[in-house]
Amino acid sequence: MCRMVLAVGRVKDGETLVDTVKSLVNAASMDPYGKEFLNEEQHRDGWGALIIGIRDSSVAMLHHRSVKPIFEDNPVGIIGPFLKSLDDVVVMMVHARAASTGTPINIFSTHPVRAITNGGSELYMIHNGSFSKDLLLKAADVSEGVASRYNDTYIANLALARRIGNDVGRDDLTWLLNHVRTGANLGVALIGSDYVSFVAGSYYRLLNDGRDGARERYYRVYMCEVGDLTIYASSTVIDHYRPSQLAKDNCRIIANGEYHKYILHNNGDMEERQVWLLSR
């Protein structure tokens, strides 16, 4: 399983984003919720980031992936200068991975994974939870032999890309949730020719097995607002390592099955946030 932070909105400088990444590093290094729920206190199976900056109709992007543990690498040194250069519209997704048992640990399976949609757009995904990989193979048009090199998130993103053209709709996400095994805390970014479509949210299955309390503590996602910037973060990041810029009163837990969609245009315009309440 994994820890992640996401951001969307407008920034004057990247310091808040840098500090949020630092908190993610701490959460990946020592995760009390992971220890409680999965007996995993570290997320050491690679990390990655997608950062998109839009200013004056100019778009810049950084996509980085590494199989090193995020807390043994230098994420602030690698992506920090880019974050600090941002001065307007931004989308950020940063992910620290703890691979599920039996899943490959390689650069292909390190998030954010990438695919090309039917319409020629780029589709990126980060994910905490697991999909039923076998059920997605046909939709992804991938053989079992080839699929063995990739994790469930890669196959899920590829299957979603095969389904869509140049946007991610509510029905598309509902379809994807029908293939969830344990949970789908997600960040999805679709990069089109003149806009970015971004979705963030949380879903996890409750099993009534006496462990739903620990399950909720592990899977819950916070939404925090700082000026014109909205940050989404895994529970450990906020409950145990909350950055000083993220006031507790400005953070809330999003509902199980709640997803938010944003559309950001290359001219700097941002459309009003859409809220989707989905269930299986």
Model-derived features with residue positions:
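N-terminal segments that mediate ammonia production and transfer
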Residues: 1-280
